[in-house]
């Protein structure tokens, strides 16, 4: 993702530069999903973005590199697209795992936390006993089967209460407004029965 933005910065240590943009293509860390990385470049600006966090609605870009004290004007932002795509895959896999856990262990299972990384994911859950090897294998098989089906996702914007009534699952740690983005996928359950899972974003 490429974008041109106005900017301001502050040096908080000898090698770490905090940058605030008027708009940003970088996703900030949220709900267990780590922030984007990439570069910010401009006249007298050469930065590598190592992390992005959200502070009261403002995205803070943690960077290393150089900024000329007299630098001004717009900068060009470039997100590491391959890394973001891997994060997106593991984000979707988190939703698939949540649904598989509910189907195999029961509706009492809730997400208690997560970590979505480009190379792996971690899913924390509530359950009354340790999972058996057979249960873990069954969950893994179900998630991998859904991934291999490669079903298209249906993305829509709905009222929060309506989405919840239709069975959409909220992500742990996320805060939602009156309108939410809902991702859903048709899922096969045996030869005849078909169902849908949906997750709020």
Region annotations inferred by a language model:
Residues 1-7, 11, 186-201:
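Single conserved hydrophobic/aromatic residue that forms the stacking wall/gate
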Residues 8-188:
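A glycine- and charged-residue-rich anion-binding loop/surface
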């Amino acid at each position: 993702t490429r974008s041109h933005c106005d900017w301001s910065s502050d040096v908080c240590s000898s090698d770490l530069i905090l940058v605030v943009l008027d708009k940003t293509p970088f996703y900030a860390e949220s709900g267990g999903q780590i922030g984007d990385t990439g570069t910010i470049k401009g006249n007298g600006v050469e930065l590598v973005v190592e992390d992005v966090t959200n502070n009261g609605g403002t995205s803070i870009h943690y960077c290393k590199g150089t900024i000329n004290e007299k630098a001004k004007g717009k900068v060009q932002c470039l997100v590491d697209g391959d890394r973001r795509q891997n994060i997106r895959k593991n984000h979707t896999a988190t939703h698939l795992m949540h649904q598989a856990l509910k189907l195999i262990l029961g509706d009492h299972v809730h997400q208690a936390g997560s970590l979505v990384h480009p190379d792996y994911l971690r899913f924390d859950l509530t359950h009354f006993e340790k999972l058996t090897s057979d249960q873990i294998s069954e969950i893994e098989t179900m998630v991998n089967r859904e991934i291999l089906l490669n079903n298209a996702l249906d993305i829509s914007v709905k009222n929060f209460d309506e989405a919840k009534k239709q069975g959409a699952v909220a992500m742990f740690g996320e805060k939602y407004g009156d309108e939410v983005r809902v991702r859903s996928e048709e899922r096969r359950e045996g030869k005849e029965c078909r169902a849908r899972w949906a997750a709020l974003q």
